[in-house]
Amino acid sequence: WEKAKEMLILPKVMEKMPDVNFYWVGDGPYRDKILPALEKFDNFHWLGHLKYPDEVRQFFSEIDIYALVSGIDMSPHTLLEAGLMKKPILATNVGGISESCKDGETCFLIKKNDSDDWINKISTLLNNKAKMKEMGESGYSYVKENFSWDKIADDFISILETNSKLASNKKN
């Protein structure tokens, strides 16, 4: 529930931003606790589960901004997918989210439980198309440079080499 209940700040955001459409993708055990609070807004649209990869790719191609509203998250792949689709990202600053993007460069990290921060950051992007494009391009580069299989393999080998040296030093 901790992950999903952060969505309950969205009514304040949607109420203050009636001209902005919000799409919720996904499903889960807490849908029945969240949907009633959101469905009363004309600018809210629940899409449910999308088939991977085609429907997910289509969704990312049609949105202007990707927002991850979460109370807790370790390392959500959706941030990387949004980056690869050159979308500016807004995400709650919890868990490992800050490791998937760079605040102010590839994303805006939002304070937990702060509807005003969401409103300000969404407005900042919607009112500055150049910033949206710049953030999307930076996100794409950041994902390519830091999350490619080659980079992951190099990092893993480096960890193994470091630990191998540490183990050798303990034996001596």
What are these regions (language model features)?
Residues D117, T124, K131-E145, D155-S158:
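A short, well-ordered alpha-helix in the C-terminal region of glycosyltransferases
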